[in-house]
Design a protein with these regions (language model features):
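Acidic, polar low-complexity linker/tail segments
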Residues: 1-44, 53-56
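Composition- and surface-driven signal marking solvent-exposed, interaction-prone regions
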Residues: 2, 58-60, 144-147
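Intrinsically disordered, low-complexity regions enriched in small/polar residues
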Residues: 7, 17-20, 33, 83, ...
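Von Willebrand factor
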Residues: 9-10, 38-94, 116-135, 139, ...
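Intrinsically disordered, low-complexity regions
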Residues: 13, 28, 55, 89, ...
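Von Willebrand factor type A / integrin I
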Residues: 85-87, 98-175
Length: 175
């Protein structure tokens, strides 16, 4: 589900444009549109590190995030660790993504107020193409998002965000 969300929400778009004809054929006086490819620029992954999310879930999340990044190759991934406030902010680029799984250091953050993530993003002018929020869903509210958001809710079938898409995951199914 994570990979599908990222690839459909922010995967690069390929399209053709007549504003720049294909130069390879101009010498033969053949005018065809040139192909333009847009790629994924920025992706935010916000990880709930309140005390109800354990190491097993964090390790599986790290591996899945790395796999997604290998698939869509974003220019930058902004990893935010949060509880009642954002307690960790790590940035990974195409060049540093290979070290992501071993170099990231989750920081614990107490309560679970997801609004701290959107406030932080606004304060730091972080404007991703999409956000993925990994949480147990025991939050005080779902906040308002300025980008598409996917909620990965662990062990809480009752949590139903009123914004974005969501998927429920059982921690015992995470391997």
């Amino acid at each position: 589900m994570l990979r599908e969300f990222v690839t459909t929400t922010c995967a690069g778009n390929d399209y053709s444009t007549w504003s720049r004809p294909n130069r390879r054929l101009l010498g033969q006086e053949i005018y065809l549109p040139s192909g333009i490819s847009e790629k994924v620029e920025d992706l935010v992954v916000a990880v709930d590190t309140s005390y109800s999310v354990g190491n097993r879930e964090l390790n599986v999340a790290k591996t899945e995030i790395k796999s997604i990044c290998d698939t869509v190759e974003p220019d930058m991934v902004r990893l935010l660790y949060w509880g009642s406030r954002v307690v960790g902010d790590e940035t990974y680029t195409v060049d540093t993504m290979n070290s992501f799984v071993t170099s990231t250091r989750p920081k614990c953050g107490g309560g679970t107020e997801v609004e701290c993530v959107t406030d932080y993003m606004q304060e730091k002018a972080i404007k991703p193409q999409a956000a993925i929020v990994i949480t147990d869903g025991y939050v005080s509210g779902w906040s308002k998002w300025d980008c598409p958001v996917l909620w990965v809710i662990i062990d809480n079938k009752g949590a139903k965000p009123n914004v974005g898409k969501y998927v429920h995951v059982r921690s015992e199914d995470m391997r």
